[in-house]
Amino acid sequence: MLIFESSRPGRQARAQAPKPTAATNDLPERFLRQQPPALPEVSEMDVVRHYTGLSQKNFSIDTHFYPLGSCTMKYNPRACHTLASLPGFLERHPATPEAMSQGFLACLYELQDILAKMTGMQTMSLAPMAGAQGEFTGVAMIRAYHEARGDKERCEMLVPDAAHGTNPATATMCGFRVREIPTNPEGDVDLEALHKALGPQTAGIMLTNPSTLGIFDRNIQVIAQSVHKAGGLLYYDGANLNAILGKVKPGDMGFDVIHLNLHKTFSTPHGGGGPGSGPVGVGEKLLPFLPVPRVARAEGGSYRWLTAEDCPQTIGPLSAWMGNAGVLLRAYIYVRLLGLEGMKRVADFSALNANYLAQRMAEAGFDLAYPMRRAGHEFVVTLKRQAKELGVTATDFAKRLLDLGFHAPTIYFPLLVPECLLIEPAETESKQTLDAFVAAMEQIAKEAQENPELLKQAPHTLPARRLDEVKAAKELDLAWKPTPHE
């Protein structure tokens, strides 16, 4: 139900009404509305009840198991929210002078340092405000590096077929031609295909390790040596860093640039479009091209902003100010609460949960896409057999899971696995929760055999039933408009 459907003529909330003297005559006539805005006429209680009711229908990490593959939907500690909301942080304006921002700048400086050490990079920039923007930043620096060397013929970016969809999109946005590298039958990058693709046109390769298949590529050092020998650079998509946090450093694998998703690995709230944070780290080659502003130590031990005047080869700023401050603070508090040993435990339990759940799913009769490999932090189940024999699809399983109180895993991604579920149980989930998920999947598998139509019509218990996805894609009518009788 839309809030407009509760609207009644003349119903208003006047507690916050402006004074009668609030004038509009200071505005030029051409900027004044000719007609009142089409807003719902509702009371304050109507508004509260409407949005409270909607919030109770949400699936979220605070209410449900949320095994959305490659999204790391882990618990967000409330201590991080509380401390990041201290008045000194909330009341600081982005334009506050450096001398009055030393506490905030100290937090950012320490976060830069911690993230650089955790990943084996020389330094970090916290400016990117999302994972995709972090990707763009990293690839833009690769382009700037080659252009600064006069290597303008390096116009090709290598991207595995198991990559996130943002990887080829980012490479294209930065002006590169994308060349896809296949995955071999065991889930690693096909080295023969890689070597054939390398040449003087190669700018670099974009990799996630562990990959979106949940598999750690055993040949990463060979890949790094081959790409570097060809004159290219290695970009690390940090989407799956949760699996190796504190255990393995991308810099030690040979990566030249990395982006992190603080809103995933470092446990800040995400979903619904934001907010995010995608810091980038670099080795020595790309250091001059890092975006600004960054935080540096000034003489006397204080902190200051580095600007384009300090970094003449920078690719420039990415936004009006400096990143999503609230997300950065929450991530800083998170790493300080955990410490190095705590971050190692994140990787331990992330991998443990993924491998336990994968084994339970296999024992329950589900087909793992790569049964010969150990899961990094997530794994892929293929329902190709069920689709062929029973006529039920990954979508049907996902919709039915909602009825049973579980958010669905990622479906139909990665694209190279047919009818797949990409399942990531973060480290904060208990064994009991994982067992309950397996029981739900077993129930759905039984229903698929006995009553497949039950799955095809799911969900049955939610306010919104099965949507017409074709119509929704073709008729993008998202704005409410009053009907004639209204």
Swiss-Prot record:
It catalyses: N(6)-[(R)-lipoyl]-L-lysyl-[glycine-cleavage complex H protein] + glycine + H(+) = N(6)-[(R)-S(8)-aminomethyldihydrolipoyl]-L-lysyl-[glycine-cleavage complex H protein] + CO2. Keywords: Oxidoreductase, Pyridoxal phosphate. The keyword Oxidoreductase applies. One of its GO terms (molecular function) is glycine dehydrogenase (decarboxylating) activity. Residues 1-26 are annotated as: Disordered. The glycine cleavage system is composed of four proteins: P, T, L and H. In this organism, the P 'protein' is a heterodimer of two subunits. Belongs to the GcvP family. C-terminal subunit subfamily. This is Probable glycine dehydrogenase (decarboxylating) subunit 2. It comes from Nitrosococcus oceani (strain ATCC 19707 / BCRC 17464 / JCM 30415 / NCIMB 11848 / C-107). The gene is gcvPB.
